[in-house]
């Protein structure tokens, strides 16, 4: 029995309470993948073998197998960062335990050291933050261009939660650098939703063109009332033609990269998703409020658990 087959068998046997597997077809039709049932209640076993995919090599990964602080591959955003969100980002809300990265949203009051009385800047005008959380990024350690990215995670779905798996380009100003949202969960059109998006530059500074997929959360809970209690597998397949985003092998959005050229501000007519100048780094965060809605205080603390992050690239 060859080594790759042994690795795949080991991975299949170690996925929590998972027992089945499903054959799915790769987006370019060139190979078949055996994917484990990702909807188990537990993370994968510590130090389980990472599966191989035909035609791909594992370029980067974090299995979160070592309890304590996240590895030095990750850096942290600090304080109030974006979108008028309620949380104060800080390192100590992120830990690794029992084979998972755990980002905890807390209802706690912390002073804003940057407070300026009378300021019109939302980041400065708040004397306190009423919530805390963490946002981790590989901006200083890893970025990639084309490939397959997988994240197995269990997300909080209480009102006010805004968990995300996303990427930003490592050059140019937003949104000309290109944003990829593999996962966002928040209130959209008055109802909880799972989103899979990308955006790029429009004609004005900080103006974005969005390709947005919005799937009502009820779509998932109608099939499994315990959906929010389980881990799920988010995947992005990205090449020079398309970007395809999945959850548990269900296609959420397929974006034609012929349509994603910046519209004329800086980086005029560049395409952030196919440009050889650009790579994208990873962010994992749990925002509170903002698009997430008014937080349900009774649901705190909130836990966003990430079993692993894996990036594969074609040979």
Show which residues each predicted segment covers:
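Sec-dependent signal peptide recognition
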Residues: 1-7
